[in-house]
Amino acid sequence: MSIVKKIEIDGKEVAFKASAAIPRIYRLKFQRDIYKDLRSLEKSIGDGDEENSNLDLFSLEMFENIAYIMAKHADGSIPDTPEEWLDDFNTFSIYQVLPQLIELWGLNVQTDVEAKKKLRNTEREMTTPLFLLRCVQLGLSMADLELLSIGLINDMYSESRNDDYNYAEIANQDDYDRF
């Protein structure tokens, strides 16, 4: 399930898409964890007051990368690099766009959680032994655990054990190559 939102940037309506694929696409493109980066940006921007924020150049680049991935996910015709995409704008304010992207991401995560609750086969409490058992059942190595989030591992386990997922499309190599 995904959510699309249009945000006005520099007088243009830009579509942004949040879905379960975003963390993977972001990690593949930038070798970073989008959850950590969004939390970091949210802390840095504070209450949206430009004068009292803790934004540095690295934070700005993280924001631009997140915005780019979500825009590219919504519109495949967007250029293949964040730099080319950003060239389309005269101004691109983190203080106007980031809060809306965080809200969009929050709506998507909330929708995913509600959908997963409906698909969950068990109401067992997630404990460390249960989590490790699931990792073993999925055949994950310690190196895999370093790269994957707990949520992604739980998603992988749910999908491997549940036939109720009805996907309209199956991703192919071309889909991954676009990102």
Can you describe what each PLM-predicted range is?
Residues 1-13, 20, 32-57, 61, ...:
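Charged interaction scaffolds used for protein-protein
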